């Protein structure tokens, strides 16, 4: 995996690669950590992690993975209820990852509303909003909503929109494109993401069709 990245880009993505390798000590890629375990691996000694999961089987697996971990807790709580309840944190700094299952038709609307409620209480926090790209109208509406919220806060926040496609989107086909809205990112992140994504297009794209979108969303 290292050979695919330049000397400039490799240090940027190495922490992530190291986490994945830790779950695959025999070097064959058989296991992939989900976002809670990736987040846990990146915690500093002074950090803590709260994960919310209502699906029983997924929650049990997560509890088992984080058992006896004094820096992490798993709650049987709807994330939409937890989102406004847990912000702002006592530390006043932190990151909120919102990645719903998108099993309901109104999931994009709930994401927009949930983010708005949390952001109103904690506009200085950092947020990651993950979404599948299937309906361009839905993703564009979400991006505009987030841009409006961030731009209207005082002081105004910042946001980035990142989307990555491994193949052209075809109606009723499998998911080939996903996105992130990143609110209040570190100031270096835009350049770092661009460097990484430029080197991921070819190896991850199917038949040379890998593409990414990286921009500041507009209201």
Regions found by a protein language model. Name each.
Residues 1-219:
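Class I S-adenosyl-L-methionine-dependent methyltransferase catalytic core
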């Amino acid at each position: 995996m290292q050979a695919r990245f330049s000397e400039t880009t490799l240090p940027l993505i190495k922490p992530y690669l190291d986490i994945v390798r830790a779950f695959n000590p025999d070097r064959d890629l058989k296991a992939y950590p989900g976002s809670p375990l990736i987040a846990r691996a990146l915690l500093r000694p002074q950090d803590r992690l709260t994960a919310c999961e209502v699906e029983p089987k997924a929650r049990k697996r997560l509890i088992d993975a984080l058992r006896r971990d004094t820096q992490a807790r798993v709650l049987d709580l709807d994330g939409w209820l937890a989102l406004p309840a847990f912000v702002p944190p006592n530390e006043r700094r932190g990151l909120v990852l919102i990645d719903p299952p998108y099993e309901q038709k109104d999931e994009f609307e709930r994401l927009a509303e949930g983010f708005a409620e949390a952001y109103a209480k904690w506009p200085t926090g950092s947020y990651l909003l993950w979404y599948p790209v299937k309906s361009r109208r839905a993703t564009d509406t979400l991006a505009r909503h987030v841009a409006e919220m961030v731009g209207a806060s005082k002081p105004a926040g910042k946001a980035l929109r990142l989307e990555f496609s491994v193949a052209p989107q075809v109606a009723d086909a499998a998911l080939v494109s996903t996105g992130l809205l990143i609110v209040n990112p570190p100031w270096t992140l835009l350049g770092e993401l661009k460097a990484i994504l430029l080197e991921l297009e070819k190896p991850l794209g199917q038949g040379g069709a890998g593409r990414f979108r990286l921009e500041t969303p507009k209201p």
